[in-house]
């Protein structure tokens, strides 16, 4: 395996390579490659979002995060339909995330909830056909981030420009990596497979309805950044009940541990370092092999 090929491994693959090393020298080499991969990934993400913020305004840095997330995910993930139609869908998803998230913010909570339901229906029914691909963790999350960090006026015009550039970049990367894949399905087949008796359709409807309802309730209760409640709901809604119950139990423990860690860092670190707590978290994610 070449150095470049080893850099392409995910965390699990890298850790298995380290674990199966035959000699100490070989293990140290694989550890060094693994650490280097994490370092350049974090550095690339930081530089990408920084450049996006410079070009389109600091208030649109979250849009840079969404674009970066889409590029990194959809260079490998796909929609299991014709590559050309998938690329068009991806562009449509960017329009949906940018326009509908802004529109919902301008409306009362209950009416905004209906807009969110319609927007998520498009994303989930057409973009999250295979739950094992976890496309909802990209598309729905991206929508909710833009919804929670909405902008207006000139800043929104800059967001439109930034997301348009992001859509072009993502579509180019996506089509380049997936144009040789062969799928018999087309968009119409995704709609035809809607079946209220299937586990997948029930899961999709749960995502589409429950997430906006949770956000609406949080907004009616005057909670700040209500979209985080929606993200929490989205992340635990899984197709199988046993998996959902397992994740909820893990999430309770994880949230408590996360709050404690953040509080400790907040009081131990000097205030100039606060802005880098997210980067520290990103490095921690780089060492993770699974998501619970």
Regions found by a protein language model. Give the residues of each.
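Alpha-helical transmembrane segments and their membrane-interface boundaries
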Residues: 1-137, 141-292
